[in-house]
Amino acid sequence: MLRSTSTVTLLSGGSAKSPGTPSRRANVCRLRLTVPPENPVPQQKEKKIERKDQPPELSNGESTKKLPQGVVYGVVRRSDPNQQKEMVVYGWSTNQLKEEMNYIKDVRATLEKVRKRMYGDYDEMRQKIRQLTQDLSVSHAQQDYLDSHIQAQASALDSFNAMNSALALDSVGLQKTLVDVTLENSNIKDQIRHLQQTYEASMDKLREKQRQLEAAQMENQLLKMRVESSQEANAEVMREMTRKLYSQYEEKLQEAQRKHSAEKEVLLEETNSFLKAIEEANKKMEAAELSLEEKDQRIGELDRLIERMEKERHQLQLQLLEHETEMSGEMADFDKNRYQQLEEASASLRERIRHLDDMVHCQQKKVKQMVEEIESLKKKVQQKQLLILQLLEKISFLEGENNELQSRLDYLTETQPKTEVETREIGVGCDLLPSTTGRTREIAVPSRSYTPYTRVLELTSKKTLT
């Protein structure tokens, strides 16, 4: 069993007032319970709501007093810093609880109306309102529980106050969103009004244009009637005008033919010069390729000569090594002649080896020079190829211009007006020069047995192998 000491304190509102005023019953009853620290109690706050119709009995010998009726008491258990457990009892009137519950009902009704208004506009607002309705259903269940048992907990009012503040904040947010929506709707209405005004203005302009078009059509009909009436009178004038126009057109056609022939001759001269340049470039390329082949053959011969020199040098070095080993061995007096012969032979071998080294070095220099010449020839061949390609592009461009001029001339001859004049018939004929496009196309670039790029690859592979 737990040992505890309890203290009951009754507060009355009439003690602080003047004696003339009527006394009021106390509406607060506090019960203080102190629990010893031996028995551990969890740190959580436990709330109990009790309805007391009878006053509690006092354990300290004080006289019992009748407590006020219709008061709800809440017991709160808490711990102080001195490791002692305390229980405090708070009391509220039923009128206060009813007012709080009515306030919650009103807030719930207003939120339900706002939710119905905003339903379908914003998904996030619907989720929030759904969450608020769930919270309100929970609070309604708590309210029913409080109404059925007529008990209130001490922390219930705090939670209700927090919930009310949250609901107030949500309602403020909903009002802000409603204001924003109304502002957007007003802006949309203004835009629609502006569009209607512009539409009406454009319709007025369209009607005006239609009226002008009708007036122009009427004028055209009148002009047609006048033209039809004056056609017979102006037939001779029209014939004269057609003759003049036809003569002017003939002059323009002849001038165009002369220009075409002159431009054609210029183009032919340019193409011939380009073809000559291509032939010269091809000849130079063939000469360069022949020189490349000769250089390749010469390099091959030099490579074989260097290989033979290397073999001979290797053999001479072996002979020198044998002579030196024989000379390093022990020799008697009668072998002095042999020793001198070996020294002379080794000296001659060293001289021959030095001479071979000089020759190999000289041949390698020659090979290097020839390789550099081959590289320069390759670059020249590439430049010639680029020049040939550029000349071929220019020739194709000139052929395109020639074809374009020919097509223009054909178009002019085809679109020549063939009006029949009553007085005389005029026919114009012109002899066109034969086209030389076929002749220019028949000139082909001289064929080669191999391309320069493959030759360059072969030479580079030979260089890497050597």
Curated annotation (Swiss-Prot):
Biased region (Low complexity) positions are 1-12
- Supply the InterPro entries for this chain: Tuftelin_GRINL1A/MYZAP/CCD68 (IPR051375)
Signal peptide stretch: 1-16
* Gene Ontology biological process: intracellular signal transduction
Record field: compositional bias (Basic and acidic residues): 44-55
Lineage top rank: taxon: Eukaryota
Report one GO cellular component: cortical actin cytoskeleton
Residue numbers spanned by region Disordered = 1-66
Report the membrane topology from the UniProt record: Peripheral membrane protein
Please describe the quaternary structure of this protein.
Interacts with DSP, MPRIP and TJP1/ZO1. Interaction with MPRIP inhibits the activation of transcription factor SRF. Interacts with GRIN1. Interacts with DYNLL1.
State its role: Plays a role in cellular signaling via Rho-related GTP-binding proteins and activation of transcription factor SRF. Targets TJP1 to cell junctions. In cortical neurons, may play a role in glutaminergic signal transduction through interaction with the NMDA receptor subunit GRIN1.
Q: Which family does it belong to?
A: Belongs to the MYZAP family.
Protein name listed in UniProt: Myocardial zonula adherens protein
Q: Look up and give the organism this protein is from.
A: Rattus norvegicus (Rat)
